[in-house]
From Swiss-Prot:
Gene3D superfamilies: Hexapeptide repeat proteins, Spore Coat Polysaccharide Biosynthesis Protein SpsA, Chain A. It is found in: Cytoplasm. Coiled coil: none annotated. This is Bifunctional protein GlmU. Residues 235-255 are annotated as: Linker.
Length: 461
């Protein structure tokens, strides 16, 4: 049976004190609702309906930009009249012969495995709820059960404000996440009433309707409470962030990575690691990052959308973005590799070296205090301290080519476009603006002049 997912995302989130819709606040640099959409897709949903209200234009623009595919449909809830009313806005799109899963845009940490257990729990002619047992269920709707045919069956959900003293003692709480047949769901939604303490159309009232028709209401449960917690303010959002990062850290360690302090790593995308990978404190990984075997990451590094080869050492305080680093390289400390950088095998970039759109050849080295932009550098090249590729003339950027085995002396400026030949040498302090042929020595600095007996000026008292 096909599956559609309805994601409720209409809440304003007043307690966030923000102009953004609540569901667009981020966990790991992704909107909360983005995590929910990812889960729906991993479940194989044919259609995903996002029910929006406040801030609809920015929500649609954000999700359209970040989510490709034709499985996403936006449905407006003009008036916020309760969860039942919100789901009902998607009813015209739902078919009778599909299953419909209801999720929440501000509950981003529900595991796909938990949702799969909910799908498996649903009877053919019934529905399924995700419930959780809480030590303090204050504010949650309570699951009401009765003994039927020797089993404690779900017969309804009572909201906190409508519960009596006995019902408030129930510690099995409703998460709001449920699964039902499309035809059944539409029928139950059409019969909802707002005759309750909130004056709203409760989605939870469909449970009693299902029981009244003799349908079995099955339940499934998350492994941990945090899976079904939402964020109504920034404190709760921070709690979700740390829980998410703790989950990722645990997965990395189980996969074989060593984390110096699991509480001090942030993964804001997808990080894959090989064996014997070591990550020191306060490192941030963004986008798609791959670390091969035996990679060592020092403290305070930021790595974004990059591939790091085997046996590479990234020393502390280095920033790497959209870069490919091949095996056996070393980087930093305090290096910056900007988009388009490539370090070939066994090359080295040292402290305070910046690269952009540059390839550093096999075995080549740039040890200190250099800027290498729009450069193609051959094998076994030595880049002296303070070398600058002058790649920008105020309008266009040009390329510097440095051949194999070249030696660039310290404090040199290479004015692009320029070619330095194989085994060529550039003397320290030179400004090179013309081609240097293979095996040539290029010098442009002024001849040294010594003045004997020179007296420095004396300050007047």
């Amino acid at each position: 049976m096909s599956l559609s997912v309805v994601i409720l995302a209409a809440g304003k989130g007043t307690r966030m004190r923000s102009s953004l819709p609540k569901v667009l606040h981020s966990v790991a640099e992704k909107p909360m609702v983005g995590h929910v959409i990812d889960s729906a897709r991993q479940l194989g949903a044919s259609n995903i309906y996002v029910v929006y209200g406040f801030g609809g234009d920015v929500l649609k623009a954000t999700l359209t930009k970040d989510n490709t595919g034709d499985d996403l449909t936006f449905v407006e809830q003009v008036e916020q009249l309760g969860t039942g009313h919100a789901v009902d806005q998607a009813s015209p799109f739902l078919t009778d012969d599909e299953d419909v899963l209801v999720l929440y845009g501000d509950v981003p940490l529900t595991k796909v495995s938990t949702l799969e257990s909910l799908l498996a729990a649903k009877p053919t002619d019934g529905m399924a709820l995700l419930t959780v047992h809480l030590a303090n269920p204050m504010g949650y709707g309570r699951i009401v059960r009765q003994e039927i045919s020797g089993k404690q069956q779900v017969v309804g959900i009572i909201e906190q404000k409508d519960a009596n003293e006995e019902q408030l003692k129930i510690n099995e709480a409703n998460t709001g996440i449920l699964l039902a047949n499309g035809g059944d769901l539409k029928r139950w939604l059409s019969n909802l009433s707002s005759d309750n303490a909130q004056g709203e159309y409760y989605l939870t009232d469909i449970i009693a309707a299902a029981h009244g028709e003799g349908k079995v209401v099955a339940t499934a449960h998350p492994e941990t409470e945090i899976e079904v917690e939402g964020a109504n303010n920034r404190v709760q959002l921070a709690t979700l962030e740390r829980a998410y990062q703790a989950r990722i850290a645990e997965e990395l360690m189980i996969a074989g990575a060593s984390l110096r302090d699991p509480a001090r790593i942030d993964v804001r995308g997808n990080l894959t690691t090989g064996t014997e990978v070591s990550i020191d404190i306060n490192c941030i990984f963004e986008g798609e990052v791959s670390l091969a075997d035996n990679v060592q990451i020092g403290a305070n590094c930021i790595i974004k959308n990059s591939t790091i080869g085997a046996n590479v050492e990234i020393k502390p305080n280095s920033i790497i973005e959209d870069t490919i680093i091949e095996a056996d390289c070393s980087v930093g400390p305090f290096a910056r590799l900007r988009p388009g950088s490539v370090m070939k095998q066994d090359s080295h970039v040292g402290n305070f070296v910046e690269m952009k759109k540059t390839t550093l050849g096999v075995g080549s080295k740039a040890g200190h205090l250099s800027y290498l932009g729009n450069a193609e550098i051959g094998t076994k090249v030595n880049i002296g301290a303070g070398t600058i590729t002058c790649n920008y003339d105020g309008v266009n950027k040009s390329t510097t080519e440095i051949g194999d085995n070249a030696f660039i002396g310290s404090n040199s400026s290479l004015v692009a476009p320029v070619i330095i030949g194989n085994s060529a040498t550039v003397g320290a302090g030179s400004v090179i603006s013309k081609e240097v042929e293979d095996n040539d020595l290029a010098l442009t600095r002024a001849k040294q002049r010594n003045i004997a007996g020179w007296q420095r000026p004396v300050k007047k008292s």
